[in-house]
Amino acid sequence: MDLSEINFAILVASLIVASTPLVLAALGELVVEKSGVLNLGVEGMMIIGAVSGFIVGVETGSAYIGMIAAALAGALLSLLFAFIILVMQANQVASGLALTIFGLGLAALMGHPYTGIKSPQIQTVSLPVLSDIPVIGQMFFKHDLIVYFSLIAVFGVWYFLNRMRSGLVLRSIGEDHDVAHSLGYRVISIRFLAITFGGAMAGVGGGYLSLVRVPQWTEGMTAGAGWIALALVVFSGWRPGRLLLGAYIFGGITILQLNLQAIGVNINIAILSMAPYLATILALVLISVSRLHGKRGAPGCLGKSFVK
């Protein structure tokens, strides 16, 4: 075992790529939860985005068209979820779980003929001047457009929620939908839009997995990424900046354990594979304990149905 074999610049660049699907899916879920809706169907939306994006990417020969298809597929599934919980007034938790099971099954059926096929590639984009900086350039400025989009989206969501009137309205609905309704805000319509955005982002995250991260279709390839995205929203305290940090920590642990396996570290492979998930559980436990002594960051109406 020789730790010097691990290239730090490549390690950081790899963790950014590994974290991107989580950033996208978790960012969408953060907006959904800020509106007062708990969507446990993120995993299902991600896997549908992954298979739809892969199929369209392979058939058209364009990974970018595949990414658009992934976003549309995730948004379409999220509209079904929105209709069930907002119009039919079904339980949010049960509906989200059912949607995840449905998504996993449908994706397995759709993707079966495409197993083992390689997807079209998304090329990396080197930012002029910045990419030439030694070490730092390789780590941060030689990535594909989806990575850059995820970073812009983090800032965009923060700005929307904290600086734009529409974002403040969405937050007010999440805190107390009855008061927001009494002030004339259209609770159902705004939640529909938030859920659709969340589904599209989850779909893009799934598409990134099958078109860039792997890149091929494998049944169940999300491997719990949707659940990790849900955990990251809680970890972040419903703040986009901390969400990005949490995703990069998880991605870093994931890539580090793969590198440790590659250099033959004397630790059981099963333990190394569990490390990212154990770290997530530990972080959630620590956050729960700390919040016993402070203010909870969750929206006041999170998970509660709105009845006119």
Where are these regions (language model features)?
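Membrane-interfacial amphipathic/re-entrant helices at transmembrane-helix boundaries
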Residues: 1-24, 38, 52, 60-65
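Hydrophobic alpha-helical transmembrane segments
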Residues: 12-15, 44, 64-72, 94-97, ...
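Hydrophobic core segments of alpha-helical transmembrane domains in multi-pass membrane transport
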Residues: 18, 25, 50-54, 104-108, ...
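Alpha-helical transmembrane segments within multi-pass membrane transporters and channels
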Residues: 61-106, 249, 254
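Transmembrane helix-bundle core of multi-pass membrane transporters
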Residues: 103-163, 263-272, 299-308
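Helix-loop-helix "hairpin" substructures at the membrane interface of multi-pass membrane proteins
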Residues: 139-217, 240-245
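Cytosolic-side transmembrane-helix boundaries in multi-pass membrane proteins
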Residues: 175-189, 260-308
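Transmembrane alpha-helical segments in multi-pass inner-membrane proteins
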Residues: 213-277
